[in-house]
Amino acid sequence: MYPHVMAVTETTTPKKNRWSFQWKELYDEVITSGLCTGCAGCVISCPHDVIGYKHEPGQYKPFHLEEELGLSNCVHGEKGCTSCTRACPRFRDWETEADEHLFGRSREPDEMSGIFKDVILTRASDDFVYEIGQDGGLVSAILIWCLENNVVDGALISGLEGDINGDGESGWKAKPMVATNRDEVLAGSGSRYTYSANTMAYPEAKERGLDRLAL
């Protein structure tokens, strides 16, 4: 009789491919394809300051500042920098990986809004915030609470440009702003019907020494 022999096969988890996508892919797949939302996340995340942005009507899109490899490629990207594609919310399919990381599963076909436990209707308990806010003033109420309870130092919000028409009233053009108190949050409450790349207020926040920021 031969002794029982059991074969043991060593299994290894396949390594994930290294993320190597850079400005070149972002330019082709998002910026020039119509997917770009103008959020300016790529601009703020760039450690080399080579991505520009014009917060003006007809613009609202990032562009490359260095022309060494042409406007559709990046010297730093060719050397391995991937910050811009990692920051972009429209670059390829990231929701599946995020769902797996946060919830341990992928969303079902009927979960178009994502995975959630409950859907709750809310409003600000402060009547003044409720009245001037949009859809109940929830976001304004959260930001005010965070500022007053030392959870954050400031918030990157959307405001409106000042008296651009000379009539004593604010214009309709949205403007990225930094809010550090209740009054500044309320000054930016309500809806905006034009682009506002709130992340463009980040440099101002850093200059003011604000590290804990809400966006």
Spans of model-derived segments:
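Ferredoxin-type iron-sulfur electron-transfer modules and their immediate structural context
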Residues: 1-45, 49-56
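Intrinsically disordered, low-complexity coil segments
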Residues: 14-18, 66-79, 163-173, 207-208
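Aromatic/His-enriched, Gly/Pro-containing loop or helix-boundary segments
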Residues: 25, 31-34, 60-77
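Short alpha-helical segments and helix-capping/turn motifs at coil-helix boundaries
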Residues: 29-31, 47, 67-72, 138-145
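Conserved structured core elements
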Residues: 36, 40, 82, 136-137, ...
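Iron-sulfur cluster-binding cysteine motifs and their immediate structural context
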Residues: 41-63, 77-104
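Short Fe-S-cluster ligation motifs
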Residues: 65-87, 119-132, 137
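Iron-sulfur-associated redox domains of electron-transfer enzymes in respiratory
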Residues: 93-215
